[in-house]
Swiss-Prot record:
Optimum temperature is 70-80 degrees Celsius. The keyword Flavoprotein does not apply. It is an enzyme of class 3 (hydrolase). One of its GO terms (molecular function) is ATP binding. Signal peptide: none annotated. Keywords: ATP-binding, Hydrolase, Nucleotide-binding. Belongs to the THEP1 NTPase family. This is Nucleoside-triphosphatase THEP1. It catalyses: a ribonucleoside 5'-triphosphate + H2O = a ribonucleoside 5'-diphosphate + phosphate + H(+). ATP binds at residues 7-14, 102-109. Has nucleotide phosphatase activity towards ATP, GTP, CTP, TTP and UTP. May hydrolyze nucleoside diphosphates with lower efficiency. Does not have kinase activity. Monomer.
Length: 178
């Protein structure tokens, strides 16, 4: 089962993913990304990756000098890959052996897609009919892979909105039990 969650920025995709991870417990393996905010000004300064193992690393920041930019955020692809690739490889191995495992990928977005290793691994995972995945994608097709995932045969595409975000969790958990 492939469950693809999309929606406008700030609608609650990552919050929903974290609730799914909490409910699935050890069945969930993967990562999510979240904003990094200045503790004093509360302004967003970057993004960090957090794995289901509890590892964290800032991979995108207004303070990074990089040729890879998304708006004013420099993206350090190596920092992202250091956490994302090992956890996704482990998740994929375990999910192939145990159908109850769920691979978590939040998000398949512009910053993450700078990594060719990530693109290749995500494509392999998403096209494997024998593994369960919960992934998030931007509302807009920011990359050909996002477009490909949005049109994946058999995948369930859910657009998260302010109207459904508080009631969709149980539906997603039910889909994963099939």
């Amino acid at each position: 089962m492939k469950i693809i969650i999309t929606g406008e920025p700030g609608v609650g995709k990552t919050t929903l993913v974290k609730k799914i991870v909490e409910r699935l417990g050890k069945r969930a393996i993967g990562f999510w990304t979240e904003e990094v905010r200045d503790p004093e000004t509360k302004k967003r300064t970057g993004f960090r990756i957090i794995t289901t193992e509890g590892k964290k690393k800032i991979f995108s920041s207004k303070f990074f000098t990089s040729k890879k930019l998304v708006g004013s955020y420099g993206v350090n692809v190596q920092y992202f890959e250091e956490l994302a690739i090992p956890i996704l490889e482990r998740a994929y191995r375990e999910a192939k052996k145990d159908r109850r495992k769920v691979i978590i990928i939040d998000e398949i977005g512009k910053m993450e897609l700078f990594s060719k290793k990530f693109r290749d691994l995500v494509r392999q995972i998403m096209h494997d009919p024998n593994v369960n995945v919960v992934a998030t994608i931007p509302i807009r097709d920011v990359h050909p892979l996002v477009k490909e995932i949005r049109r994946l045969p058999g995948a369930v595409l859910i657009e998260l909105t302010p109207e459904n975000r508080d009631v969709i969790l149980e539906d997603i958990l039910s889909l994963l039990e099939r």
